[in-house]
Amino acid sequence: MSVINVGQAVVLGAVEGVTEFLPVSSTGHLKITEGLMGIPVDDNAVVGFSAVIQVGAIAAVLVYFFKDIVRIVSAWGRGLRNRDERHHHDYKFAWWVIYATIPIVIVGLAAKSLIEGPLASLWVVAASLIVGSGVMWAADQMGRHKRGEDDTSFKDAMLVGSSQILALLFPGFSRSGATMSTALILDLDRVAATRLSFFLGIPALTGAGLYELKDALGTGVGVAPLAVGTIVSFVVAYGSISWLLKFVAKHSFNAFVIYRIVIGVLLLGLLGTGVLS
């Protein structure tokens, strides 16, 4: 029998879709939701399920940014064949995304047991939500928001890509929150920071989802819940991406900072009263 039923998969898929690209921690929200629904958050099958439905959210990025991705991949292909094409920013950017993914892959494989063990604690999630909100607020205040997407460099990509490790080790910190905060500190504007976070998430999250697929299927999650959760994640994430890009073009990240603190304190309360464990 599957440890997650179709109804629960719909809820979790929606939570994943809404929160994956918002700087509020999808992992934290999934763990809270799983706990409230009585799903064992530390079960290998559940951890695998959470990683697999991320692929739906990533598919939404691929569809939403299809023209940009085709342009970048095409430039990369032309550059591989012709040296004269290698000065184009899109060619360089494709390599930067690849290089910037290497650190999180190394840490993810090396620290897998730690990440899925002690660091998966809801106490860690709560603390990371609150601490991460402080980092995000400081980054938004410090950043001069003067550099656009075309101004990004190899250094930017590596620093922003490496910051994903924070969310890997401290679920609740938020991959989007870590990458956007780092980009803001590097003086990228909010839209450029958000778009860079999207592109850097494609290889990292896709790889994690495919890697965990065997655990999800082999240890207690049925095909139907996986499929439903992934599809719901895709649909909801597409809408979330569209909304976020419009929001950051006109607003600061303060709303996310406040929301993270509220959720972090709420989670501490639920843990302290024994509602969640």
Curated annotation (Swiss-Prot):
Keyword terms of this UniProt record: Antibiotic resistance, Cell membrane, Cell shape, Cell wall biogenesis/degradation, Hydrolase, Membrane, Peptidoglycan synthesis, Transmembrane, Transmembrane helix
Any one Gene Ontology biological process term? peptidoglycan biosynthetic process
Q: What is its EC number?
A: 3.6.1.27
Subcellular location(s): the record lists: Cell membrane
Q: How does it sit in the membrane?
A: Multi-pass membrane protein
GO MF terms listed in the record are: undecaprenyl-diphosphatase activity
Chain segments annotated as transmembrane:
46-66, 95-115, 119-139, 165-185, 191-211, 216-236, 256-276
Q: What else is known?
A: Bacitracin is thought to be involved in the inhibition of peptidoglycan synthesis by sequestering undecaprenyl diphosphate, thereby reducing the pool of lipid carrier available.
User: Which family, according to UniProt?
Assistant: Belongs to the UppP family.
NCBIfam families xref list: PRK00281.2-1, undec_PP_bacA
Q: What is this protein called?
A: Undecaprenyl-diphosphatase 1
Q: Which organism is it from?
A: Streptomyces avermitilis (strain ATCC 31267 / DSM 46492 / JCM 5070 / NBRC 14893 / NCIMB 12804 / NRRL 8165 / MA-4680)
Lineage of the species this protein comes from: Bacteria, Bacillati, Actinomycetota, Actinomycetes, Kitasatosporales
